[in-house]
């Protein structure tokens, strides 16, 4: 079974930092560990785990993919503009 959280406004690399710690754990262990992680991405992963709890009896496996990037512009000196990429990600949970 696959569960997804899509278009999360966080960089995929920052979310992968949390997901690597939890990959392969049982549901109970992963939900306990994610509560005490000091990263902002842990809240998104915890929400995804919470929505799956009825079906989760085995090990959980996570995947993080890049979603479409929001492109913004930062105004700079002398009428120049620098691009800013606000990255998003999709988190997939497999049981």
UniProtKB/Swiss-Prot annotation:
Function of the molecule: This protein binds specifically to 23S rRNA. The globular domain of the protein is located near the polypeptide exit tunnel on the outside of the subunit, while an extended beta-hairpin is found that lines the wall of the exit tunnel in the center of the 70S ribosome.
Gene Ontology annotations of biological process type: translation
Subcellular location field: Plastid, Chloroplast
GO MF: rRNA binding; structural constituent of ribosome
Gene giving rise to this polypeptide: rpl22
Quaternary structure (record): Part of the 50S ribosomal subunit.
Organism: Cyanidioschyzon merolae (strain NIES-3377 / 10D) (Unicellular red alga)
Family, per entry: Belongs to the universal ribosomal protein uL22 family.
Protein name: Large ribosomal subunit protein uL22c
InterPro entries membership: Ribosomal_uL22 (IPR001063), Ribosomal_uL22_bac/org-type (IPR047867), Ribosomal_uL22_sf (IPR036394)
PANTHER family in the record: CHLOROPLAST 50S RIBOSOMAL PROTEIN L22-RELATED (PTHR13501), LARGE RIBOSOMAL SUBUNIT PROTEIN UL22M (PTHR13501:SF8)
A Pfam family the protein falls into: Ribosomal_L22
GO (cellular component) term, any one: chloroplast
Assigned keywords, A-Z: Chloroplast, Plastid, Ribonucleoprotein, Ribosomal protein, RNA-binding, rRNA-binding
């Amino acid at each position: 079974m696959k569960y997804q959280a899509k278009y999360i406004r966080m960089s995929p690399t920052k979310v992968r930092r949390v997901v690597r710690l939890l990959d392969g754990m049982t549901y109970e262990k992963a939900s306990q560990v994610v509560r005490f992680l000091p990263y902002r991405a842990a809240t998104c992963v915890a929400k995804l785990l919470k929505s799956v709890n009825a079906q989760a009896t085995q090990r959980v496996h996570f995947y993080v993919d890049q979603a479409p990037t929001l492109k913004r512009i930062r105004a700079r000196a002398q009428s120049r503009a620098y691009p800013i990429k606000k990255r998003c990600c999709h988190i997939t949970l497999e049981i």
